[in-house]
Amino acid sequence: MNNSVDFGGRPFHFIGIGGIGMSALAYVLAKRQLPVSGSDLRPNHITRKLESIGTHIFSRQEASNLEFFGSKVSSTEIELNTQEMFPVGKSTLPQVVCSTAINSNNLEYQAAIELGCPILHRSDVLAALINDYHSVAVAGTHGKTTTSSMIGYMLLEAGLDPTIIVGGEVNAWEGNARLGQSSYLVAEADESDGSLVKHAPEIGIITNIELDHPDHYDTLEEVVDIFQTFAKGCKTLIGSVDCETVRELLRNASGDRQQPTITYSLHQDTEADYTVTNIDYRADGTTALVWEKGKALGVLKLKLLSRHNLSNALAAVAVGRLVGLEFGEIAKGIAGFEGARRRFEFRGEVDGITFIDDYAHHPSEIRATLAAARLQARPGQRVVAIFQPHRYSRTLTFLEEFSESFSHADLVVLTDIYSAGEPNLGLISGENLAEKIAQEHPQVVYQPTLSTVCEYLLKNLRPGDLALFLGAGNLNQAIPEIITTLCAPATATL
């Protein structure tokens, strides 16, 4: 692929523009008044939002889509903004952007090669944007979306007006991206396909490192290599020493680095730069006293409940201090942050049943999310975990770990595996996982489809239950159906 990105006015065409990562980039480029088009076979609210700001989106993927901007220029009905976009002699063949999910037999991808269009990976565009700004890039196996969103919100509330690109939707800016007018950029940096190595931000954060994405990585060592390369490219590196792998990476990198390294921890008995004491988990959130290099800064309050979100907040504190914010400004921003969608997101309450949607799909994420649910649950309240496994490769690789991840749930309801495009080789199924979990947890029910999940929950959820829908697939589509059905004889709080 061609790694050179042209922000000078040459069009961009995104293959699969409706994806969460692709759409965020397309949004920022379109808001920068660059010509953007894209295609997606499954139009959604994200593509409709892009269309509302002038992005042309095709619902079919065809070679002719790449000639859209050329036809606009040659048309006798040229709009004024099109003339401005394409001065005389400017190439109208687009830069074609794709993600790892797009394979080489895609019609638009093949057409791009034949036409000689520059072909960019999604990460190339993000890397170029990171280089264009005073940038903060958040990396890590878990917590990227929440941490980057929290930092973005904190800087926004402090008046720094950042550009923000994250892997989830945030109500504060009604989407997964916003274009700011300042020189600051906050971005989520994805490690899933190895492209993390392309990013060289001014401030880089590593929240934690675990083996995940077994479709791309065979060993933890391979994952660590990617993060080590990322770390070397950061002018300032921030890392959580509560993760043993991050701690080891920082230790090994310290001798090679001329740049500052900043650490944070939930344990004051470490030598971390930022720590906390007096942690208090309440139904309405979390409070803690924050320390900076042994000096008390003040009390931090979060609307989010859990240890992992407090850790994410410490990363935000470190960033805030680096960019010159007073602790009061930092605390105000973090206190107002309500989280990202599908990250322990409240979806409704009816008949005393609370519905929560969470993206957790790795064993560690499930454990942390259910632990947070148990903290929030009232005495006697059941925690019901409804889980849709994501990818055959992940389910097979972490079969043992998944079986040990549901100890905080009173009842586990399991669906079949959401393939995310992977072929079913017959090596693992949702039913196999249910049987494995049942060895550790006596209350496990297997319901293979969304319709059978809905039927089961409508019959078996009780008033007072805390129902958590877990997974990165489409399980959350069942929530509105269940709430609507329950609402027939009752009144829901949405």
Swiss-Prot record:
It is found in: Cytoplasm. It comes from the Bacteria. Belongs to the MurCDEF family. It comes from Nostoc sp. (strain PCC 7120 / SAG 25.82 / UTEX 2576). ATP binds at G140, T141, H142, G143, K144, T145, T146. GO terms for cellular component: cytoplasm. Keywords: ATP-binding, Cell cycle, Cell division, Cell shape, Cell wall biogenesis/degradation, Cytoplasm, Ligase, Nucleotide-binding, Peptidoglycan synthesis. Its EC number is 6.3.2.8. Pfam families: Mur_ligase, Mur_ligase_C, Mur_ligase_M. This is UDP-N-acetylmuramate--L-alanine ligase. Pathway: Cell wall biogenesis; peptidoglycan biosynthesis. Cell wall formation. InterPro entries: Mur-like_cat_sf, Mur_ligase_C, Mur_ligase_C_dom_sf, Mur_ligase_cen, Mur_ligase_N, MurCDEF_pg_biosynth, UDP-N-AcMur_Ala_ligase_MurC. The gene is murC. One of its GO terms (molecular function) is UDP-N-acetylmuramate-L-alanine ligase activity. Coiled coil: none annotated. GO terms for biological process: cell division; cell wall organization; peptidoglycan biosynthetic process; regulation of cell shape. It catalyses: UDP-N-acetyl-alpha-D-muramate + L-alanine + ATP = UDP-N-acetyl-alpha-D-muramoyl-L-alanine + ADP + phosphate + H(+).
